[in-house]
């Protein structure tokens, strides 16, 4: 039985910008946090400044959207049953050096055999699609916008969890 309702959230860029994980932003650009490399640090600071300027520009016309749902759920072996629909999942595939078990998302949901339903939240986040098309003739700005769009989608999920 499906009693779930999709909920859509829309945020402005400035609402989610404080939640940006800048470490991953810099990793995407090939910067590793090392204080001793002053030249790299200066480059990173310039990139940070330009990223914030771009956020201010994007805030004028674009938003970040999230759709989420809380679903009735149970695990059936390696499968999840969400609102009555079966979703096959995989277990971890790479052996652990310590011999720990191969985990699957279904391991964290109440089993169907318990007869008691559990709840699982699912969501997707994205910036307005047109953002990815900006600056087609400027490789640097295009990459900057795309990297920011990834981080903004992630930031919106952090805000959603408040």
Language-model-detected regions and their locations in the chain:
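C-terminal substrate/ligand-recognition segments
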Residues: 141-161
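Active-site loops and adjacent core secondary-structure elements that bind or stabilize anionic groups
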Residues: 1-143, 147
């Amino acid at each position: 039985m499906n009693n779930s309702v999709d909920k859509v959230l829309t945020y402005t860029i400035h609402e989610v910008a404080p939640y940006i994980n800048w470490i991953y932003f810099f990793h995407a650009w090939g910067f590793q946090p090392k204080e001793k490399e002053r030249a790299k640090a200066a480059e990173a600071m310039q990139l940070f400044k330009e990223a914030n300027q771009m956020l201010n520009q994007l805030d004028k016309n674009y938003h970040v959207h999230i759709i989420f749902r809380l679903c009735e759920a149970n695990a059936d072996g390696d499968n999840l049953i969400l609102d009555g629909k079966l979703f096959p999942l995989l277990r971890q595939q790479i052996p652990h050096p310590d011999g720990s078990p191969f985990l699957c998302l279904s391991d964290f949901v109440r089993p169907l055999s318990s007869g008691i339903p559990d709840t699982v939240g699912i969501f997707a986040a994205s910036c307005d699609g047109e953002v990815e098309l900006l600056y087609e003739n400027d490789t640097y700005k295009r990459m900057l916008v795309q990297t920011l769009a990834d981080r903004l989608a992630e930031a919106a999920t952090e805000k959603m969890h408040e």
